[in-house]
């Protein structure tokens, strides 16, 4: 602690500001990750089968077994690193194996389960087919896109894919997911190269990529998540590359990839915000004037692209403009509502219902949502124990599922086929399901423990 204080005193004013800003996010990050690590040690969240909605359930974990396994893993890795000199060739071999493994296991999952689409994926697929047939009714009345116009980017991808490869060609879309997953694994290695320059870390990363079972299970998931991930990770790499080299050429792929990722999944805007903060701090520290243009394009290009997509579909549908959609505040209000059947703060269709009840008026919907938020806050303020229980259940139900709902997604999608193989059924409903759960649970706990130690140190 004394050494850290002396180091802080020796910093320049700019360095002190950046250090303090780092603590602003690092301390909450440590608290959340450490709490989740403790929860994960004693309890595991999993999803109930055979239902039409997510239903998180909980079971006790085996803390001593988890700790012993982690200790054995650390001991084994330490022994190997000391016994064998880690060369560039060894790192390259591990990376190549992780990439080959990503391709192999992803394709294996595709051809094992041979699933179709369901839930929101089915809505998007049907809308893309309607668009190809000149039917844009989902953009009018109480249509799906009146509520969720942010899905137009993914629908555009589906429309193009169906036009080129045939209607409902889910295999091609799943192959695109494989490409996105390989892109993610490859560029994670490149980011590690840029940030750490340590062969041991490269090998650890390769091993972690091999263990990404939830990601590989999502290969069959036809939605914006996986394609956008395959774009946003390389976008981050090119931003890091620019920060390290200040070569302006890297800003171009960063902007293009970030824009495409946001079009497919609006949640990628979170990464955009993080990139803006980092580039802004870089500009202050290094007096890099080009960052101003970089930031303008990084912010403006997704907006312009989104406007272009909306304008195209508005013209095709004969509308003056695309509906504004459900205000974001509706998700906040829904996330603060109790739910005895599913779980606190989970999706309960409130956002859809409140928007419909207010005749698709964004302003009136916002007012109703703010009232709902105030009501929830007042309830929490008046009943602290209820508040604590609410957020505890919300937290563990969402962040203590080591499978990230990948297994329940496979189960939902598999219902649309009657010819599943015995091996597929073994992993969906049989003991194979529990084997996957155990592997993902150990992986999940290991990641949380390592992240907690890193944030603390």
Residues covered by each model-derived region:
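Extracytoplasmic catalytic/substrate-binding loops of multi-pass membrane glycan-assembly enzymes
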Residues: 113-129, 133-168, 368-369, 388
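Membrane-proximal stem/loop segments at transmembrane-domain junctions that anchor or position
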Residues: 313-418
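Membrane-interface anchor segments at the N-terminal boundary of transmembrane helices
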Residues: 18, 53-68, 172, 394-457
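Loop-to-helix entry region of an early transmembrane alpha helix in multi-pass inner-membrane enzymes
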Residues: 148, 152, 156, 164-183, ...
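Short acidic/glycine- and proline-prone juxtamembrane loop motifs at membrane-interface regions
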Residues: 214-228
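Transmembrane-helix motifs of polytopic, lipid-linked glycan transferases
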Residues: 175-196, 234, 449-454
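Transmembrane-helix signature of polytopic, membrane-embedded enzymes
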Residues: 188-211
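Start-transfer (signal-anchor) and selected internal transmembrane alpha helices
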Residues: 1-108, 291-299
